[in-house]
Regions:
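Hydrophobic ligand-binding cavity/cleft-lining segments
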Residues: 4, 8-84
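Intrinsic-disorder/low-complexity, polar/charged segments enriched in Ser/Thr/Lys/Arg/Asp/Glu/Gln
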Residues: 39-45, 110, 134-138
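Acidic/polar N-terminal loop/beta-strand segments that form early-domain functional surfaces
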Residues: 49-51, 116, 142
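Short aromatic-glycine motifs in intrinsically disordered, low-complexity regions
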Residues: 84-94
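Hydrophobic-ligand binding "helix-grip"
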Residues: 93-133
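Beta-strand/loop substructures that line and gate deep hydrophobic ligand-binding cavities in soluble
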Residues: 118-165
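A conserved amphipathic terminal alpha-helix motif
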Residues: 153-189
Length: 189
């Protein structure tokens, strides 16, 4: 057991370093069902000094310059344009779709999105850190396997397997960009 001041110092050190790390999917996570059913599922987290609402996190995540590039690609690749205002509506809970995703489930501190083909899930969650030292931001993904019509076996497919390294790096970049944006916003207030 560590003291409150040690916990605060640990959060400050992690937030200052901008560390994004792989972490277990929390037991209460909306994404957990996919890990349990054999889908590929991952989870990354980072800590932010200060109180960050789930709404603020979702909006920051989908409006970073990194994610805006993905939105631009989706606009042309699958004819699914999106705006910062739509990201804000998604964050506020007044929209059930955004770019190439639709809301599969949401709670006070979580959002689970499904892509337009039903193969991938994106998940965001916030959780307060012990002693009010800050907020933990989570980002995870799931890829639902397809069933081979001949063998009946499930598999993720060669395209996903080939892109897994990129996916892991990109996930860390996205979460780091959201964390940086939120830290900047918190510093301005």
């Amino acid at each position: 057991s560590c003291s409150c001041s040690e916990t605060v110092m640990q959060v400050q050190a992690a937030a200052a370093s901008g560390s994004v790390r792989s972490c277990p999917i929390p037991a209460n996570a909306l994404l957990e069902q996919y890990r349990q059913d054999g889908s590929y599922a991952d989870c990354y987290c980072t800590d932010v000094i200060g109180d960050v609402s789930h709404e603020r996190y979702v909006e920051a995540f989908y409006t970073t310059s990194v994610f805006k590039l993905e939105r631009l690609i989706l606009r042309f690749a699958v004819s699914r344009p999106s705006t910062d205002a739509q990201a804000a509506q998604l964050a506020q809970g007044t929209a059930d779709s955004f770019a190439a995703w639709s809301v599969e489930a949401r709670s006070d501190n979580q959002l689970l999105l499904c892509d337009l083909h039903g193969r991938t899930r994106s998940w965001l969650m916030t959780a307060p850190l012990e002693n009010g030292a800050g907020t933990r931001l989570y980002f995870g993904s799931a890829v639902v396997p397809t069933r081979d019509k001949k063998s009946g076996e499930t598999r993720l497919g060669p395209a996903f397997s080939g892109l897994l390294g990129f996916h892991r790096l990109y996930s860390k970049i996205l979460l780091s960009a959201a964390r940086s944006r939120l830290q900047s916003q918190l510093a301005d207030h």
